Amino acid sequence: MPFITISNHPYGHIDGLILADYFGHLRTDYKIMVTQFLERVEALTPSLISVTPTGVERTAATAKSIMGVRRALTHLRSGGALGLLPAGAISDFSLRDGCVRDREWQPAIIAFMAKAQVPILPVRFLDRNSAFFYMLGLIDWRVRLLRLPAEVFNKAHCPVRLCLGPLISVEEQRQYLATHTLEEYGLWLRTYCSRV
């Protein structure tokens, strides 16, 4: 049975690795859609579908991204399982909300999920990076990025805590989309992820 996992993005690049490892033990056909950065680790390539971010404005899809999306749809249509990190970037500290939270989900990923027409499994990472990491992000995201390798290594001997939510059926999604916009659909799915 094809399905999509959706998840928050608290740690950075290792989120995709953790999901690929966890679900890869359950389903050998599980792949995760990631930015091209992880593609450089050749041992991971069979578990990845790579897309290229299009920059800060995210104005136009690149050929690599279009091919990645096509590969992902083909993978699902052939019965595969796919992992998505819809925020597309690591969680950060929101001064407005006073907490660490995912960024807004990417409209292209929301549209992809609606088009895929497969069950969706919400997954939530319960932990996050250090307070120091988020404090650096208040200075500048590039300063915070320099800290990311240390954040990966300080979790080396810590268990990763995941919660899996209820599977959201295709019928539930269709019913919701019949009376709501894609943006509302994205918020609805995001709520599932945060409640898990």
Question: How would you label these PLM feature ranges?
Answer:
Residues M1-F3, G80:
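Surface-exposed loop/turn positions
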Residues F3-A61:
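Catalytic core of membrane glycerolipid acyltransferases/transacylases, capturing the structured
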Residues S65-V196:
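Non-catalytic C-terminal accessory region of glycerolipid acyltransferases
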